[in-house]
Regions:
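N-terminal helix-turn-helix DNA-binding core of bacterial DNA-binding proteins
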Residues: 1-24
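Alpha-helical residues within the helix-turn-helix
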Residues: 20, 37-38
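Key DNA-contact positions within bacterial/archaeal DNA-binding proteins
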Residues: 27
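Basic amphipathic alpha-helical segments that dock to polyanions
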Residues: 32-36
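Residue cluster at the C-terminal edge of the helix-turn-helix DNA-binding motif
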Residues: 38-41, 69
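Beta-hairpin "wing" of winged helix-turn-helix
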Residues: 41-55
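Non-DNA-binding regulatory cores of transcription-related proteins
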Residues: 55-120
Length: 120
């Protein structure tokens, strides 16, 4: 995303070029960009000179949205993940879980304030 943000004024860039510059495999990069595209953070341009570019200004994309697009959630702890709650018999009465939820909320709020443009 930083690579695209740096080129924002110059148009789209081919994934192969990003893969080469960032030393990332094409297959992995294709998976990342599928998630970013689905989330509306990047868009693909087809044809000669085509490739990917940011779907909106880097100043309007926050880091939280990028992480959610790539990871699906921000749950750092198993016991705070909705899917895992059913496996924890102590969830509702666990003091640690409530602290961890507060930590995750603080991290989420912070990441929502950081814009992609700030990383340039």
């Amino acid at each position: 995303m930083i690579n695209l943000a740096k080129r924002q004024e110059r148009g789209s860039v081919a994934l192969a070029q990003i893969a080469e510059e960032e030393k990332i495999s094409m297959k992995y990069l294709e998976r990342l960009f599928a998630g970013l595209k689905k989330a509306g953070l990047v868009k693909a341009e087809i044809g000669s000179g085509g490739g990917y570019k940011l779907a909106k200004s880097a100043s309007k994309i926050n880091i939280y949205d990028i992480i959610i697009a790539l990871e699906g959630s921000l749950n750092a702890f198993h016991c705070t993940d909705d899917k895992e709650k059913i496996y924890c018999s102590k969830f509702c009465n666990c003091e640690v879980t409530h602290v961890l939820l507060k930590v995750e909320q603080a991290v989420s709020q912070t990441l929502k304030k950081i814009k992609l443009s700030q990383l340039l």
